[in-house]
């Protein structure tokens, strides 16, 4: 969400006044007359003098609030406009001493009291300097106005100028106050939206301090690193979470049900509200008697227990949950599964990467972290995600299953554990083989078949970024590579094995995606299409297009590399020939000597 304060920024105009640069600042609330008076004051001309602005190439500039801004290098030149007083048949009410009617032509004359010394160069060639004007029937040409009359006129003009000045200052003050109030209101709104982010940062700092303290106090431990703090207690907020409840528009509600939903447009508060809406929309709050306040506390605590990793963060959690929600509607899963299964699918999707440290299972095992030791090298991260999920649910304030009978909770717990453990990509081939075997005679009434289908569904959602439009999917690739490179850099520094697809010196965006799309994503979604044909157009077609796009990108990269090699070869060859010529010249000079 943007600041919004830039719309209230005043405009600055630079004027060239006899070779001196004068800066004039005004707000968008000034009118053309106000701006012209400011320019007159800046240039030393009387107020209400008609002036024109010229650019450096003598083009005229309109004097109004929307006039184009300039810089000190391109100041505008100010020129007074010479207005020729045309004669008009105005009858003078006063008769001259000779009894004649004063209907003779008017002569141009400067008004007494406003005459200013003429500046050199004030009028360009081709302009007409105003001639002095003689009031009709009052004085003969060459006759001076009496001093008392001149003093009276000057006094009146001074009072009028003072009144105009006060009026302009009041208007400017009002505009400035309104401007500041609007900016302050916008800032208050923005600061309110940052409350959750600030609390999240505080929580992360606290966790880092506790982790550092735990590391420094640990001695003679075979584990190199610890991502756990045994004394950490997940304490949710006792009060109702402070994130605002957004009212989703009908367009947002409709878009939320589709895989094309743009997950990058939403702030954490808005994502929390969207997740809350999903539970209400699917009837889970109603069917399982979930307290709405408890649901909000649970979502807030889940948000707090996702780390700020480049990829495995709360936005990824929302991305997976939203894809699961869209598949429920796309494939009409509520007709195939019970509400308990829908609750398991949605809750497992939200919790599937809780407290992810940003380093995968391979690193955990090779570095002998506390997670790997605790779970005996068997899916250490996925086991940890499950443990954190049920630590949160163990808190009464966050237990969204508190009104479910013990047998029902046991079924939900076992289902969530099964699905979260299935997200370990080391088990991908095993799960796919089992599912393909069941696909030959798939039975929706068979519990084993349905469990495998749920495992495939959460796997599809977990790695479904390329199903989304290119502008939504591509930033996720950059985030994932950044996390991979962080891990490979750490593995290099610690002398651990480095996977080629994580090495910043070997992998590119195209090479990273082509194999994954061709051999993991497309086969898995093709299998799902056999049960749900509607998946082909909505999800499989974007995968084919993504594969073709990255293959084309790889061809371009390869061509550029080949061209670079040829260029380097030619350059090195030319350099070698130049060295040989230099040696030949030196040898010939030596022979001559």
Swiss-Prot record:
Protein's name in the database: High affinity cGMP-specific 3',5'-cyclic phosphodiesterase 9A
Organism encoding this protein: Homo sapiens (Human)
Cofactor requirements of the protein: Zn(2+); Mg(2+)
Superkingdom to which the source organism belongs: Eukaryota
Binding site for Zn(2+): 316, 352-353, 462
Start and end residues of each PDEase domain: 236-557
EC number(s) on file: 3.1.4.35
Entry-linked Gene3D superfamilies: 3'5'-cyclic nucleotide phosphodiesterase, catalytic domain
Cellular component per GO, a single term: nucleoplasm
Substrates-to-products reaction catalysed: 3',5'-cyclic GMP + H2O = GMP + H(+)
Biological process per Gene Ontology, one example term: negative regulation of neural precursor cell proliferation
Active site as annotated: 312 (proton donor)
Region entry Disordered, spans: 87-141, 564-593
């Amino acid at each position: 969400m943007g600041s919004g304060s830039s719309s209230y920024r005043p405009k600055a105009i630079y004027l060239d006044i006899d070779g001196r640069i004068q800066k004039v600042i005004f707000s968008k609330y000034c009118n053309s007359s106000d701006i012209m008076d400011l320019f007159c004051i800046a240039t030393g001309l009387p107020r209400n003098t008609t002036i024109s602005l010229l650019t450096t190439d003598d083009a005229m500039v309109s004097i109004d609030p929307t006039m184009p801004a300039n810089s000190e290098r391109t100041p505008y030149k100010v020129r007074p406009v010479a207005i020729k007083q045309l004669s008009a048949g105005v009858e003078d009410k006063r008769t001259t001493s000779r009894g004649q009617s004063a209907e003779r032509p008017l002569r141009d004359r400067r008004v007494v009291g406003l005459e200013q010394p003429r500046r050199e160069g004030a009028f360009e060639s081709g302009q007409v300097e105003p001639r002095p004007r003689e009031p009709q029937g009052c004085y003969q040409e060459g006759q001076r106005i009496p001093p008392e009359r001149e003093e009276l006129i000057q006094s009146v003009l001074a009072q009028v100028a003072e009144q105009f000045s006060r009026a302009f200052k009041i208007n400017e003050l009002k505009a400035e106050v309104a401007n500041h109030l609007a900016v302050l209101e916008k800032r208050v709104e923005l600061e309110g939206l940052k409350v959750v982010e600030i609390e999240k940062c505080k929580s992360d700092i606290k966790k880092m301090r506790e982790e550092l303290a735990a590391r420094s106090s640990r001695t003679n431990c075979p584990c190199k690193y610890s991502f756990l703090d045994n004394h950490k207690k997940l304490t949710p907020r006792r009060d109702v979470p402070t994130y605002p409840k957004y009212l989703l528009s009908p367009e947002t509600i409709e878009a939320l049900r589709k895989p094309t939903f743009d997950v990058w447009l939403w702030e954490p508060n808005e994502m929390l509200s969207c997740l809350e809406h999903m539970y209400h929309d699917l009837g889970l709050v109603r069917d399982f008697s979930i307290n709405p306040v408890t649901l909000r506390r649970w979502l807030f605590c889940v948000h707090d227990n996702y780390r700020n990793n480049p990829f495995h963060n709360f936005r990824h959690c929302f991305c997976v949950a939203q894809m699961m929600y869209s598949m429920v509607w796309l494939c009409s899963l509520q007709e195939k599964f019970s509400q308990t299964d829908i609750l398991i699918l949605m809750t497992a999707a939200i919790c599937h990467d809780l407290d992810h440290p940003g380093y995968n299972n391979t690193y955990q095992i090779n570095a002998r972290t506390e997670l790997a030791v605790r779970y005996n090298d068997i899916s250490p991260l996925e086991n940890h995600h499950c443990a954190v999920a049920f630590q949160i649910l163990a808190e009464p304030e966050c237990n969204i299953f508190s009104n479910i009978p013990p047998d029902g909770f046991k079924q939900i717990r076992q289902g969530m554990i099964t699905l979260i453990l299935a997200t370990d990509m080391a088990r991908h081939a095993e799960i796919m083989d089992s599912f393909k075997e069941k696909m030959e005679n798939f039975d929706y009434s068979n519990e084993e078949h349905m469990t495998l289908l749920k495992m495939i569904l959460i796997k599809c959602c977990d790695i479904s970024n390329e199903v989304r439009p290119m502008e939504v999917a591509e930033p996720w690739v950059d985030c994932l590579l950044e996390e991979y490179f962080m891990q490979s850099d750490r593995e290099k520094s610690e002398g651990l094995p480095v996977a080629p697809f994580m090495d910043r010196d070997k992998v590119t965006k195209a090479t990273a995606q082509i194999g994954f799309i061709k051999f993991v994503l497309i086969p898995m979604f093709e299998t799902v299409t056999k049960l749900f044909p509607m998946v082909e157009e909505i999800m499989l077609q974007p995968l084919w297009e993504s594969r073709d796009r990255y293959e084309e990108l790889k061809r371009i990269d390869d061509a550029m590399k080949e061209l670079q090699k040829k260029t380097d070869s030619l350059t090195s060859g030319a350099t070698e020939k130049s060295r040989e010529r230099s040696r030949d010249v030196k040898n010939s000079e030596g022979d001559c000597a």
